[in-house]
């Protein structure tokens, strides 16, 4: 009887030790993840410039929505993107890259690939909205919602997913922070026409592992919005608001 009692102790200790070892391993993973994946905006060496990828929606055969005769969404978004790029010429802190330089077809996958290739710290996709009626107006800011993975199996897979979820959380927090900055700046362009921040699956943002937002800058179906967006002075105003948002973010 005594032998049986004594022989059962090592098994309980072994089980306990395995549990303790996994807890220690998990703690180390969490600590290392914080060291290896700091907040996105501090990941760059301070001697390097932050890279912002501006994505002017549509292009080439894809016109987007029509604002007036001969003027389409693809034209307005590219003009605004180029104006932003011009505002940062000579900047020692921030470098602007565009997902398309002219009126060309650029698949969504190539836009994402360019963000990854350029090691962008921030992604901003610019669009013009359209509604089912003439009353809808103003701007909207979208960011990719957070989704945890539930497919992990085993201790190592679970710890790996925890690290990934921590990175996703940081990117989401930074995306929301930038979205709020944009919201405040754009309110000066479209006063009292803020349609709020929108969370959800955004196609153009999927596959990105950096802070990223999509801006719907106004409604082509609304006469007042359409007139604003077709005006060159207003396009410069929008570009300046977005440039100031980028500066404030970093």
Residue ranges and their predicted role:
Residues 1-20:
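N-terminal secretory signal peptides that target proteins for export/translocation
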Residues 24-35:
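Bacterial N-terminal signal peptides
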Residues 41-161, 168-173, 178, 240:
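Catalytic-core regions of hydrolytic enzymes
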Residues 128-133, 183, 187-250:
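Active-site-adjacent mobile loop/cap segments within catalytic or ligand-binding domains
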Residues 166-169, 226:
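Alpha-helix C-capping/helix-to-loop hinge sites
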